[in-house]
Amino acid sequence: MNEKITTLDEFIFKRQNDFEYAAGELTALLRDIGVAAKIINREVNRAGLVNILGVQGDTNFTGDTVQKLDIYANDKIIECLKNSGMCCGVASEENDDYIPFPALFSKFGNYVVLMDPLDGSSNIDVNVSVGTIFAIYRRTSPSEGPATLEDFLQKGIKQVAAGYVLYGTSTILVYTTGKGVNGFTLDPSIGEFCLSHRDIMIPARGNYYSVNQGYYLKFDLEMRRYIDYCSDENLGLRYIGSMVADVHRIMFQGGIFLYPSTRRHPQGKLRLLYECNPMSFIVEQAGGKAISCDMNRIMEIEATALHQKSSIAIGSPDMVDEMQAFIQKYSAQRG
């Protein structure tokens, strides 16, 4: 007998009491993000048929070329969050500053959302997987006023929920509220995300490492030695160029994802608030680890700016520990 299908909405509602503030607001907010993901998925699937491929012609705050689909995804998520009334503001990789919502749209707005609306969007023109990453925090500012910058600059350990959506051969939404990690696959026949991966746990080790080896000569000597070690140990190199896709594979098959600092980007290149924190929360909840390449736990890093960057090593716990020990050993030898 087939097991009853559990939709994302049903699952979120059943788990509502897991939330510290079980008033239904976070439940509604997560549902609205699911709605936005369906809308984006539709456009991703039609991207080659409509005028939405290619670059917009602009660069965002951190210098990345903006794709047309970046703008579409960004606008749709903001629209869904604004209409929900459960969110007092949003910060996005695609916007220079955070966007506070007027009181009219945030009557119950006790949360803020930070997001990368379309991670890996440069891949869309060649039909390679892209994704959405989001983090949700409870606001720290008074509820009767507008959102403030401090609401968004909270440490990753303060996240109340985080998730990602991978738009690939099938579309899957993975999220956590600090009570484990679950995945939901979009069933196009009914237009619903359905529970497909319950209580995801990352393997302690894996046979893969993921890094942009084109930057090899720009990495610190210790990191180059570690990458050489991975190759010598016959680990397979897998790198897609979309953090969501690369980390999603590691979630199920094990391994380690690396985005080290370089001479050009001494603090790293990925955004702490939009990419590193939410993905770290998810991976840690699945039993993995996430640290910066200077050996600090990602979710403990103090944010001082919306678009702050960080290096990251994330994935199977034994492999992250091994990398940390390896780097520290060779750093000590260099004095």
Regions found by a protein language model. Give the residues of each.
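Alpha-helical scaffold segments that form or flank carboxylate-/histidine-based iron centers
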Residues: D64-Q67
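IMPase-like, lithium-sensitive Mg2+-dependent phosphomonoesterase catalytic core
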Residues: M1-N51, D58-T59, I71-G335
